[in-house]
Amino acid sequence: MAGHMLMPLRRRPWTCRACLQRLQQPRRSLETAASPSSQSDVYDYAPTNHSTQKKSNDETLRRVFDSQPFWREFSQRSATQSKPTGLVQNQYLTNPDGFRAFANVSLQRCQAIVAKVLAASTLEEYRDMARDLDRLSDLLCRVIDLSDFIRVIHPDPRVQEAATQAYALMFEYMNVLNTTTGLNDQLKKAASNPDVTSYWSEEEKIVAQILIKDFSNSAIHMPPNERQRFVNLSNDISQLGSNFVNSAEPAKSQVVVGANSLRGLDPILVQQIRRWNRTASVPTTGMIPRLALRSVHDEGVRREVYLATRTSSSRQLHRLEELLSKRAELAQLSGHASFGHMTLSDKMAKSPEAVSNFLTALVGSNREYVQEELSKLQAMKGGSPLQPWDHAYYVHQRVLQYSQSRRSRELSAVPEFFSLGTVMQGLSRLFDRLYGVRLVPQETAAGETWNPDVRRLDVVDEAERHIAVIYCDLFSRPNKHPNPAHFTLRCAREISSEEVAECATMDHSAHPNDGMATAVDPQSKTLRQLPTIALVCDFAEPPATGAGRPSLLSEHSVRTLFHEMGHALHSILGQTRLQSISGTRCATDFAELPSVLMERFATEPAVLSMYARHWQTDQPLSESMMLSMEKDRLAHGSIYGAVENEAQILMALVDQAYHSIPADKAGQIDSTAIYHQVSSAHSTLPDPTDSRPPTSWQGFFGHLYGYGATYYSYIFDRAIANKIWEDVFQAGKAAVDREAGERYKNEVLRWGGGRNGWDCVAGVLGSANAANANGRLAEGGDEAMREVGRWGLGRDGVSG
């Protein structure tokens, strides 16, 4: 896959532009599915008494996650179905060989669209072009996104292999598209013709511009020799980046100290690393050095361990500097001043200078809190100045003091009120209250899921219309990837009548959405493919017998689940007509906003009172415990939150500094000198500059590859989310207010990536907001970035 020219550079031009991350319908004939008269068939269990059905669904939602016996009974209702369906209802994926068929059918459809676009000559054909190319993107996404997910999540090696082959086939074809200059020429011809663009919808114009930008970044317009250089550089960057991420190593593998100087560290650990001559070898990677920095009383030992854990090997630094050099050359070849300029041109920030304005303003808005935190640690240390290797030690002392308090002990009971089913119930109730959509558990057909533990939820609106499908794979199992994530398996999109007719001429069982969920839009009467989402977490499984506790979540896990459901909500409500801009397919520095904002709802008292109940007694979480939770968050935030924020800001500043290097300076990059310049200028507790060798923490900063020039995005979205929380949801007072929810939905969520992010922010805050006087935020630019920096990040520390 390293041969694909765009992978290391930016998102794939023909596929997902998303964030870093992703009722059994009776089979109907295509004519029925597309017919407005059959609208009730699309979502087939609209109850006669909505409130009774709603209450029943609400209770079922809790029980399918909390009770294994209930789940087994619920999921077996459709076990008698003789004909199995395919994975996620995809009609091709009933066995491993189905992946090949799925890829081949999709490939043939792609080739037909490419032939149509290349042969276009009439005004009507050029007017179809944006929609045709969006469908081409969708066909590729259908295979690539789903295969990429299944090859990682499915337990059967045969299915993994088949999915990998389907993925590779479509990826290879995408490489062909990237070098098909005729597609670029035809699209540019269409986009420059006023008789075409005046006919296009706003969505079509946006998608055309996105694709033109992607083509330009794939070197398609360059002479053959330059294009080959571009391909070679891209391949080099891909290889270097992969090596950089996977080969991080310290300059020294261990620090040898006197065993007696490790007082404070767990004696069992000391025994493990003790040597025969009364010394001990403290490793410089893993958990032991982190524990040593928190607990060893001897400052000299902490200093040695700290410096060693932040000093990279020279090989790793060479990898990074070569990566940065080749990225600078790639940008120059593409006509940009730097890699940062190239990467940011289609983001909200637009330029490295604007990002630096934002980050510098953020340092200022955070500085007072940092000094407040450090002054308390300095008071604990006493005479000599606080050093960077002191921070973890004194923070740990403060946390220990706090954790011995009565309130902290009281909070150990909080997870009893957060069974997984209860939290899912809370999410559904919150979505219903704010946006008029809710989660309804649905039986799965044989073959529909990759593991028996996967629950399916249908998302329905207030008219009981089916609008999305979520597959929840939330329980731990051997060899499962532990990191929580949201995956878009299929994007929302309008299916044209031509596609329906095309299916009718194929095999009798062909379906315009491959058998996956569809619905008829009540306004336009057109058929739509519904977003299909997978939510993956790693929570403890409830006991098989049903006796004992269900899966109980910590407050952190609750926030994580709300975060991932924030991404899902963007996919659910951002249902555009074209898939290239649906849901989370928006600018990278806007994609985390819905998920970060959702975290704020998780522990807001008005929201907690809607769902937090004891798993055994059904008693609601008391107001006093809610207050204790809030005080606990504030206490921890005031101990280390601002310093955590500063660390994230510094990482983003380092990322910008590295990726703003022009090509003519790329031959002599000293990444360590740049790191120390940024740290000395902006850090309140910088690494010393006189240690030999100097610290080189940048060698451990793996995100420099995957998030090159965009690491600021997460904290940028945090600042915007904080502002929306404070001003639209009134710092929680309007957390369950429908008017606030509708405003946020209509100004932000429903657009997906089909509206400039600054217009979304200006729209949701409103022109009466002082930060957006006269709607000035809509213009974006340097001053808007500075303004967001002034909003700050609050005191919670880095969440998620």
UniProtKB/Swiss-Prot annotation:
Gene3D superfamilies: Collagenase (Catalytic Domain) (3.40.390.10), Neurolysin, domain 3 (1.10.1370.10). It is found in: Mitochondrion matrix. Cleaves proteins, imported into the mitochondrion, to their mature size. While most mitochondrial precursor proteins are processed to the mature form in one step by mitochondrial processing peptidase (MPP), the sequential cleavage by MIP of an octapeptide after initial processing by MPP is a required step for a subgroup of nuclear-encoded precursor proteins destined for the matrix or the inner membrane. It comes from Aspergillus oryzae (strain ATCC 42149 / RIB 40). InterPro entries: M3A_MIP, MetalloPept_cat_dom_sf, Neurolysin/TOP_dom2, Pept_M3A_M3B, Pept_M3A_M3B_dom. The lineage of its organism: Eukaryota, Fungi, Dikarya, Ascomycota, Pezizomycotina. It holds the Pfam family Peptidase_M3. GO terms for molecular function: metal ion binding; metalloendopeptidase activity. One of its GO terms (cellular component) is mitochondrial matrix. This is Mitochondrial intermediate peptidase. GO terms for biological process: peptide metabolic process; protein processing involved in protein targeting to mitochondrion. Its cofactor is Zn(2+). Binds 1 zinc ion.
